[in-house]
Amino acid sequence: MLARRLAALLFLLAFALLASQLPAATPATTPPAVQAVEAIGITVGDMDRAVDFYSRVLFFETVSDVEIAGDEAERLQGVFGLRMRVVRMRLGDELIELTEYLTPRGRPVPPDSRSNDRWFQHIAIIVSDMDQAYLWLRRHKVRHLSPGPQRLPDWNPNAGGIQAFYFADPDGHPLEILQFPPDKGDSRWQQPGDRVFLGIDHTAIVVGDTGASLGFYRDALGMKVVGESENWGPEQERLNNVFGARLRITTLRAEAGPAIELLEYLTPRDGRPAPADVRANDLVHWQTLLTVREAPAAARAFMGSRFTFVSPGVVTVADARLGFREGFLIRDPDGHGLQLRAR
């Protein structure tokens, strides 16, 4: 009996010694929830007018045009009794998805909206020639949100030489045209060609606390921080049309698609929070469309968190015209909408 115990003890000691010599197991890397920023969704009040503007003024091309109703769409968007027309449009490699709610009609963009209000979101359209692009927009009588194009100063190493201008679409949604200098931006924006309006570099959203937003976009969604900057001065103030504007800017990217840019106004701090009762049919509602591998797994990452689900959970979509099989709508810490979709 004693001999057997000694043998067992020697075996355990030998096994422990062998295990200590083996390399530590490397934990499996969890893939990011988000594969791509697929498109930027915008709720519009009049689809025919919006399509005319984006195609005739900004050179987007229509990809699809469908009308949707029924229980699945209602649960997905959190709007009962809806009928919506959804139009996808492309500029370069990037997509926008315009949605008009034929019923129920939503509220307009507040006429006193400012660039530091936390419902602010825009798309940054890259242009090859700012002077030509601005002249074209003037010819089409777009509504200015900046007094004119601004060139950010060279003392700022992360933004110096960038030219940008804010304006509005017919519903009052903010838009930006932007031209990178040769040493900044993706190399594809510097390729020679005869087009002026090239594509969408990013969508920008105003946030109240960059740290809280990184907990959502970086930590929960798995997007990567690819750029940071702090911008201030008269050029930045006039671009945003906010006196005393000083911004902390953080850029995140998924594996594919446009970036998401977080804009935190360090000063002034008087930007208003998004109304708590915003619904998807209100014209201040944007929804950034994110492609995920598995919608249920992505949804579980948010269960029990302080992030707000608009959909009651993952919604299975039988209508193939929408281009995905399941998804859900959620709001980030500042109320910006994101729809996570699995194909």
Indicate residue ranges for each PLM-predicted region.
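Post-signal peptide N-terminal segment of secreted/secretory-pathway proteins
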Residues: L76-L82, V86-M89, D93-I96, E100, ...
